[in-house]
């Protein structure tokens, strides 16, 4: 099993994470809290009360875990295609796989990624939702002192299953949308690349960016449910399950609640995934 795809996925994912985490923090706040009037209001309040560092809450743990999560995504995707088509990454330009194979490989990568991602994503969301202002004399300390303390607190207060809160919604989110992600990327690359050649840097950037947007527009409704399920149980249980969360959210906030965060998701998705795919492609070409 080639390991280059796993290593390239790790490095490219880390670059994309650093670029996109501030957008992700705003998105999570908009989905789980009703105190903000919109994206700009959320950004202003985060900066005013928590300083610039507020946008990077919860990032240290994803940086540490991205080695596992993105390696699984890109590694499983590429190696599933290897099994389905008997072609390596470089050979696929001359012998492009079918879109069905691409979709199946993407869904496989998304499904396995979700199980690796679930505990890390839960901790990230909990830390991002800490709205305490920057440290001042006499101010109360935040509930969680950091990712390790957060993980230990969840385990102690909610049990081992608590670390996988929202995992079912995460799996339903990632399995089909990662298939969409790779189909969009490959389709755009093929459209604007001469047959048998590698796509140009500009093509990779544009294809990666639009692949990110397409997948996140499809993912946003379940992403909202996932975020709310992850915050459920922090103080008291509100939802009986994913279906109850969906029904309660519609009843209280209307159908529009499912697309809360879609604008910030799209704004984040283009640059993050453009950089992710560009670094991924160039690392694999460099390794030959």
From Swiss-Prot:
InterPro entries: Mit_carrier, Mitochondrial_Carrier, Mitochondrial_sb/sol_carrier, Mt_carrier_dom_sf. GO terms for cellular component: mitochondrial inner membrane; mitochondrion. Keywords: Membrane, Mitochondrion, Mitochondrion inner membrane, Repeat, Transmembrane, Transmembrane helix, Transport. PROSITE patterns: SOLCAR (PS50920). The chain crosses the membrane at residues 6-26, 63-83, 100-120, 166-186, 202-222, 266-286. Pfam families: Mito_carr. It is found in: Mitochondrion inner membrane. Disulfide bonds: none annotated. GO terms for molecular function: transmembrane transporter activity. It is a multi-pass membrane protein. PANTHER family: MITOCHONDRIAL BASIC AMINO ACIDS TRANSPORTER-RELATED, SOLUTE CARRIER FAMILY 25 MEMBER 45. This is Solute carrier family 25 member 45. The lineage of its organism: Eukaryota, Metazoa, Chordata, Craniata, Vertebrata.
């Amino acid at each position: 099993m080639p390991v280059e795809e796993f290593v390239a996925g790790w490095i490219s994912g880390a670059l994309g994470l650093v670029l996109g985490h501030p957008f992700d923090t705003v998105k999570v706040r908009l989905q789980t809290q009703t105190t903000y009037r919109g994206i700009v209001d959320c950004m202003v309040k985060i900066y005013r009360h928590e300083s610039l560092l507020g946008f990077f809450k919860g990032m240290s743990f994803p940086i540490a875990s991205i080695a596992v999560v993105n390696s699984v995504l890109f590694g499983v995707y590429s190696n599933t295609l290897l099994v389905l088509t008997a072609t390596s990454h470089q050979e696929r330009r001359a012998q492009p796989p079918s879109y069905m194979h691409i979709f199946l490989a993407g869904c496989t990568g998304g499904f396995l990624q979700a199980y690796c991602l679930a505990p890390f994503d839960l901790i990230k969301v909990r830390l991002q939702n800490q709205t305490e202002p920057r440290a001042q004399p006499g101010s109360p300390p935040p509930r969680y002192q950091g990712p390790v303390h957060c993980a230990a607190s969840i385990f102690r207060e909610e049990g081992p299953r608590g670390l996988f809160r929202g995992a079912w919604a995460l799996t339903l989110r990632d399995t089909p949308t990662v298939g969409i992600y790779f189909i969009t990327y490959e389709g755009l690359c093929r459209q604007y690349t001469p047959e048998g050649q590698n796509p140009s840097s500009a093509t990779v950037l544009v294809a990666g960016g639009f692949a990110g947007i397409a997948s996140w527009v499809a993912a946003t409704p379940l992403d909202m449910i996932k975020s709310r399920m992850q915050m459920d149980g922090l103080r008291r249980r509100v939802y009986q399950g994913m279906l109850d969360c969906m029904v309660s959210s519609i009843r209280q906030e209307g159908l529009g609640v499912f697309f809360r965060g879609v604008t910030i998701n799209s704004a984040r998705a283009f640059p993050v995934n453009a950089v992710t795919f560009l670094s991924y492609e160039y690392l694999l070409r460099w390794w030959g």
